[in-house]
């Protein structure tokens, strides 16, 4: 191969360079050596990357059929977004949910399930008439994402072995509920997920369950958007949070993970780890100090109070069982969507 290997210079170093040589990380003492793979002093160590960062979806996903328990007003697909090959998954295939304050998009990943979310007052800008300002001055921001990674090993990342079977994802427009259904390779376990941004409890709820011989083994992490200047994510007691401040508003977001009795939920600096679970619920709340009724459009609440507001919402939601949260949301959301119906006859 006549192509020169790529290399990078180590930050703060006068003459140290790194390159990747056939799966090994090589350290060189000058650029010429790195480019030509020759020269004095170098050290080589084998690269062992984590599969979590190498892959976005399992290799084999077999399509399923339209679920029978969703309304006739529903969008459904039998392939995860990561398998569609589109360049902009958020714009083209992610399914949106919202309650007027908190919104999310779901992509239906099996290996990596990304729940991107935003909140309607997370605004990058200041008060006043924005019509005279540059287009980039103020705009609504993406808050971030919850990442739920499958750690079970039940499916294959790099071969057609152990395929995901009967996969389908959907958005029930009448009930304001998204979902993903699929089965294990041997069809001995049925997996189901339900997502909704509660119209009554004002939180995002993501419900994961496995019925059959296999259990859920998940890692849940927080990924703040890179454009909002968020502080470090803090993981503690089965939950996570982050906060920050932009030109006008200060903000906070937090989630809590719960699982059935008998499952193991542990927390470390890398995230929340759930093992041997039959069901897992993830609850998210987010808020800012924006208040259009106050001077300067600020509520006057400090960072601690904003965080307390978020935690109060989470505490109230997690005190209820999942079925109650689900039924309350569907009853309220569908009451709006069923107010009228237009039937255009053939």
Regions found by a protein language model. Give the residues of each.
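Extracellular glycan-recognition/adhesion modules and their associated mucin-like linkers
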Residues: 1-24, 34-52
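Aromatic-residue-lined binding/catalytic grooves and analogous aromatic/hydrophobic interfacial grooves
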Residues: 50-346
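Beta-strand-rich extracellular passenger or scaffold domains
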Residues: 27-29
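Intrinsic disorder/low-complexity detector
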Residues: 3, 21-22, 31-32, 39, ...
């Amino acid at each position: 191969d006549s192509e020169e290997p790529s290399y990078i210079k180590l930050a703060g170093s006068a003459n140290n360079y790194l390159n990747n040589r056939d799966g090994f990380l090589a350290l060189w003492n000058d650029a010429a050596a790195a480019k030509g793979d020759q020269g004095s002093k170098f050290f080589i160590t084998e690269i062992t990357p984590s599969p979590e960062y190498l892959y976005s979806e399992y290799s084999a996903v077999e399509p399923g059929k339209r679920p029978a328990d969703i309304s006739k007003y529903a969008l459904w697909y039998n392939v995860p977004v990561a398998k569609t090959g589109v360049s902009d998954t958020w714009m083209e295939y992610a399914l949106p949910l919202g309650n007027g304050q908190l919104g999310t998009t779901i992509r239906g990943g099996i290996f990596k399930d990304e729940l991107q979310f935003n909140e309607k007052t997370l605004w990058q800008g200041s008060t006043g008439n924005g019509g005279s300002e540059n287009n980039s001055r103020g705009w609504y921001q993406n808050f971030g994402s919850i990442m739920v990674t499958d750690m079970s090993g039940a499916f294959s990342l790099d071969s057609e072995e152990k395929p995901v079977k009967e996969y389908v994802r959907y958005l029930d427009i009448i009930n304001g509920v998204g979902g993903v259904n699929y089965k294990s390779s041997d069809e001995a376990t049925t997996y189901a997920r339900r997502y909704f941004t509660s119209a009554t409890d004002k939180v995002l709820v993501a419900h994961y369950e496995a019925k059959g011989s296999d259990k859920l083994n998940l890692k849940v992490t927080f990924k703040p958007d890179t454009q909002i200047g968020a502080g470090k994510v803090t993981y503690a007691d089965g939950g996570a949070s982050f906060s920050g401040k932009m030109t006008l508003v200060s903000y906070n977001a937090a989630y809590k993970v719960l699982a059935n009795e008998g499952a193991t939920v542990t927390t470390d600096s890398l995230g929340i780890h759930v093992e041997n679970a039959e069901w897992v619920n993830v609850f998210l709340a987010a808020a800012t100090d924006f208040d259009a009724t106050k001077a300067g459009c600020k509520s006057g609440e400090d960072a601690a109070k904003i965080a307390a507001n978020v935690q109060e919402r989470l505490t109230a939601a997690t005190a209820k069982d999942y079925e109650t949260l689900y039924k309350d949301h569907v009853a309220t959301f569908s009451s709006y969507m069923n107010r009228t119906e237009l039937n255009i006859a053939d």
